[in-house]
Amino acid sequence: MAGVSAAWELSRAGWEDRFASITLYQRGWVLGGKGASTRADDGRILEHGLHVWLGYYDNAFRLVRECYAELDRTRSDPTCPIRTWQDAFTPAPDVGVFEHRGSATGTWVARFGTNELVPGEAAPDPDLGTLIRRGAALAADLVRSSRERPGVRVDAAVDLVTTVLRGMSADGLLRPGGGGFAAVDHLDFRTWLLHHGAAPETVDGGLVRGMYDLVFGYRRGDRTQPAFSAGLGVFLAVRMFLDYKGAIFWKMTAGMGDVVFAPLHQALDRRGVGLRYFHRVDALRTDDGGARLAAVELTRQVPGRVVDGYDPLVRVGDLPCFPSRPLADGLGEHCPTEAEPWPSSGGRVSLEIGRDVDEVVLAVGLGAVPLVAADIVAEQPRWRAMIEHVRTVPTRSAQLWLRDDEATLGWAHPGATVSGLDAPFDTCASMTHLLAAEGGEPDRAPRALAYLCSALPEGAPPVTETTEAFLNGWADALWPRGGPKSLEDERLHAHHTSTNTDPSDRYVQSLPGSSQHRLRADGSGVAHLVLAGDWIDCGLNAGCIEAATISGIQAAAVIEGRPLSDRVLGPLTWDAA
């Protein structure tokens, strides 16, 4: 998303007066990075993992809203089922945690109140008094929506919110000169909560554990080693619970590739941005002792003449989507195969600074940085420190299509997203609403859909084995009236698993003390090289699409000589001076 966001910002109206060309290079045939999704031959959505958008993702929502407004599908593509951003996203106010109380377990799902605010629209930054009033309103919402006595679990949520507000005030995190949230980045979130008076039951409970699950906050993916920056924890608690717009969560009504990246591909193409698929970045070459970028070395995976004419999208139910396999009729004999999934029949390409390009935005995933920028990492201590301290973790996910509906299965919370489960998957989301976008024969189609995800510990068995183990151990808890107990269970219509170990697919963590080692968009130390990605210091130092979007906005600002904060929505108080 970071590179797409930068291209979007740079290609605003009149860009031809500022630049000769803008070109985005993408490995393979699918745009979107960790947010990419495709469609199987039968129309099923295949994701990297579970994606929900939080209600404070103003910059990401603004980008999507601008994209849909520009495409104007109501006029230009009236048969498309998703024509506006409101068609693409639906509020998801039901959020829960799975609780472990001694030998007893149970699911607590609360309905967070919705509001009339619109994500992506500018709004005044809330002060502490406003946050306190919102916290009181949130507590009342939770009491009203809980199916239990208020004292059983709601008190933990109230304790969390009040502790965060009390601690923010005590530490002066919103006070000018207080250092912002970066002042407590060196602490673990749980440690900080205890220091400011949170009950141990709250800190060890499902709600806090769910926040760690949300950011895959476990060293090396090991759930016995929770680690999550207090700076980000406080920032996230405030923005997620007290500063959301419309709803706390928003879910997409089709795959993320369908509703975000396919429209962006279309809009960027319409703007005249060059979209060069099948290009893998191999290396950044420098000169002047590493102070200046000299060239970008790429491998062209198919011949250039094929790239020039390749259209990556197909229509599923009249919705433009990326296919799970490259389109053979567009590539001919150059189509990747199982024997050679990443061919290099197009040869190598060298983009020379001053001859082919003037400025470069590096927007690969952090895991790929040591590979493509090996010389820079070797030459610059700040890059080495970033690679050492800003860590990544692989993730795993499973999608389960079920033959019975959720009521028959006994799942009492349609549409809910629940965290705090135990290994091997810590989060389960009801995604049955996506079945309408997948189509299929009504008499044979699945009737429920669940997404599972978690960090992937070192040495973990294959995800198919862990999914099998999960169903065997957790089916009764999730679907007490009879869910599938194995991948071969006839109650399971289909399944799809994903192990995200590719360097660019690894999730960027926010471990205590790591933010100080992130580089800013303008901080590469290499002339002609600007940085973008959810791994840079962008003011929201978290692995999420909002951070990636902000980083792209900032990268564009650097290239155009504008302040980093220009066009960034939301409070930039991470390191307030």
Language-model segments: residues:
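N-terminal Rossmann-fold NAD(P) dinucleotide-binding loop
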Residues: 3
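A short, Lys/Arg-enriched amphipathic alpha-helix followed by its capping loop at the start of a domain
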Residues: 6-20, 267-273
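Short, glycine/acidic-rich hinge or "gate" loops at secondary-structure transitions
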Residues: 73-88, 277-278, 564-574
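C-terminal segments that line or cap access tunnels to active or ligand-binding sites in enzymes
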Residues: 176-178, 184, 235-266, 279, ...
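Dinucleotide-binding Rossmann-like beta1-alpha1 core, especially the glycine-rich loop
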Residues: 42-152
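Glycine-rich FAD pyrophosphate-binding loop
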Residues: 11-40
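Short, solvent-exposed loop/turn and secondary-structure capping segments
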Residues: 33-37, 223, 227, 371-376, ...
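Active-site/ligand-binding neighborhood in enzyme catalytic cores
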Residues: 147-347, 352
